[in-house]
Amino acid sequence: PNPSPMSRKQAFQFLDLPRTMPTRIPVELRTSGDWGELYGKFDKAEAQYQSGRCLDCGNPYCSWKCPVHNAIPQWLQLVQENRIEEAAALCHSTNPLPEVCGRVCPQDRLCEGSCTLEEFGAVTIGAVEKYIVDTAFKMGWRPDLGNVHPTGHRVAVIGAGPAGLACADRLARAGIEAVVYDRYEQIGGLLQFGIPSFKLDKSVIGKRREILEGLGGRV
């Protein structure tokens, strides 16, 4: 049977909701000493607008193509409902560095490139992920390990690059104290010294250090 006018409208509503990106900082500002991140951030309305474009596919290719299999449709739904802290917790459950991936991950070849809407303009997944974590941190949210029981074990992690930080995060979630060693005072490795500030502001890495120490890790 032919679909009703209402169901047809709902099925194709994404055609009326175009893909949008955060504001790109003007060249004039970027060449006058502002070496901050190239793109701004979504506000609440923009993040909810983009999240609302998600079709909630039965077989979400965005999650499948994501190397860490983020629960993307689920946290997009939480953003629509303004449940930011829950969205941040869900992001952290699969990804120890979501604030980094929201900025520098090649979404066009991974989650966004696999979005069912890609032909019409994929959901701006990376920008929403950045919004979730930055907003949650600003609200004072931190990962909750209240249900984790300390094992009394301590593990040394050599290198405070992305892999070392991710390892320390997962150890903390298993109740193991991680002590991270690095030759440099600043943590981050490639994130700190290899990725320019216009892609990844270094304050983001400083915040990750604070989070790690809050989880009981030491650097």
Segments (PLM) and residue ranges:
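Glycine-rich FAD pyrophosphate-binding loop
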Residues: I176-Q192
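N-terminal Rossmann-like dinucleotide/flavin-binding domain of flavoprotein oxidoreductases
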Residues: A88-P98, V128, L191-V219
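Ferredoxin-type iron-sulfur electron-transfer modules and their immediate structural context
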Residues: P1-R154
